[in-house]
Amino acid sequence: QFGLDPSPADTNSGHGTHIAVSVLGNGSGDAAATGVAPEANLVMYALEHDPTGTFGRIGSIYDMLRDAEQMTARISVNAWGLNGNYGQYTADARSVDTFVHDKKDLTPIFSVGDRGSFGASQVSSPATGKNVIAVGASTTGVPGTPSAGAVVNFSSLGPSLDGRIKPDVVAPGVGLCSGLAEEAQSPAGASCLSGNHAGGNAYYMTLSGTSQATAIASGVAGLTREFIREQVGIAAPSSALVKAAMINGARDLGTADIPNAAEGWGEVDLERTVLPMDGTTVLDTFVDDKKSLSPGFGLLYSFSIDASHGLDMTLAWTLSLIHI
């Protein structure tokens, strides 16, 4: 409907299947390749034209997000970005921001791109959007790759050209072993784990990129949203709340003080996001997302804090249309 290729098959690189399995694969082929959120449901759009490998979209990204939202999707996984206009706030970025303003409980997540060698402000649009979560890639320590705990050198750097922090977070994106489409004719990576489809392709292949990092971050976003719904009791968590929770739980990789133009606010960490104190205790949660502020005004809150613990506060908001 929105892609260049009407076929549901992934006959070119297998990129889309690799992303989908990383997010929500059920591990039926090999438990080691279970996705981050294996009980999630999938709404998919074929944006890669398999006969040519060309990427493209038909219609507006606003309409695509609206279609997904109407089919109950609440996390939008976008392991792609536009060529050119790097670092710029484009019409597509504005379109995504407008949709999030209109439908505040869908969280769009975009890869920043793999242009780390080109210097600063190389983030692809729509990751330059203001109401999105823009994801860069971190190392994993997979054998033959750099040690875990750093931003990988191919991950595009921020900030946006108008000075905003990008990426927002990073996630593991090096040497990820995930699903390979049975019909893929030009697999983009080497096979991993064991087992083969009837047609000869391996079940799994290894890929690296901010696309792969976006899949991991999107799975974390889905589980974070589920936690807020089921454990905190907020039936329809806003995109801003999911973003705030993930940023608050992100781990500083230590390359520079956060936030910075390489890792944003740090590497996503599900445990620190939902159980930040000791990994076992569900905290009392206070959320106030109903008030708005005008220039020159403020809101005052008072909390009683255990002196033996610190206080972390993260503010995230969905920009109004006049600021988009």
Residue ranges and their predicted role:
Residues L4, S147, V151, G199-T206, ...:
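Flexible glycine/proline-enriched surface loops and loop-helix/loop-strand junctions
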Residues G310-S320:
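A short beta-strand element within beta-rich, extracytoplasmic domains
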Residues M44, A171, A202-Y204, E226-A307:
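C-terminal subdomain of the subtilisin-like protease fold in secreted/lumenal serine endopeptidases
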Residues D5-T11, A190, A198-T210:
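Short pre-catalytic strand/loop immediately N-terminal to key active-site residues, enriched for Gly-Thr
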Residues I322-I324:
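Conserved small/polar residues in nucleotide/adenosyl-binding loops
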Residues Q1-R57, M71-S76, N83-Q88, D102-T107, ...:
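Subtilisin-like serine protease catalytic core
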